[in-house]
Design a protein with these regions (language model features):
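Active-site glycine/GP-rich loop and adjacent strand/helix microenvironment
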Residues: 1-141
């Protein structure tokens, strides 16, 4: 849409909820946000991070750091040793514990790379090389 038109939506919150899911060329999140912000005439693009297997989502207010609700915790683990959990600032695979999933599996090991930050925040750096494309809209095929 923003490739063909420009908008003045400066009083609007624009939420990005994921990548191209293999349907178009994948863009780096920062580049996508820059294109969307310019095209929609807004200062920041907000983001949502979640998946079908979880009941909770994390949100970013446009600075690239996702915040979790109190019942959701994100961990990073070493990419070569799944038993080694990493500290803040270190890049690793994201693992999520969502206590809202109390009647199902509350622990998810993703194929997303990320980094932990203070105050229960994290950033998503991309997907692990050669990982499956994810996204519930791909189930239609």
């Amino acid at each position: 849409l923003v490739e063909q038109y420009s908008f003045d939506l400066k009083h609007t919150l624009i939420m990005e909820t994921g990548g191209m899911k293999g349907r178009r060329k994948e863009l780096i999140r920062e580049d996508l946000h820059e294109q969307l912000a310019t095209g929609f005439g807004v200062e920041h693009i907000h983001s949502e991070y979640g998946m079908t297997e979880l009941l909770s989502q994390a949100y970013s207010k446009g600075e690239g750091l996702f915040s979790c609700p109190p019942w959701m915790q994100v961990f990073t683990r070493d990419t070569t040793d799944p038993f080694t959990f990493l500290t803040e600032g270190m890049m690793g695979n994201l693992n999520i514990m969502d206590l809202a999933n109390r009647e199902s599996c509350a622990f998810i090991a993703t194929q997303d790379l990320g980094r932990l930050h203070p105050k229960n925040q994290f950033e998503v750096l991309g997907r692990v090389d050669h990982s499956d494309i994810r996204g519930c809209n791909l189930l239609v095929y």
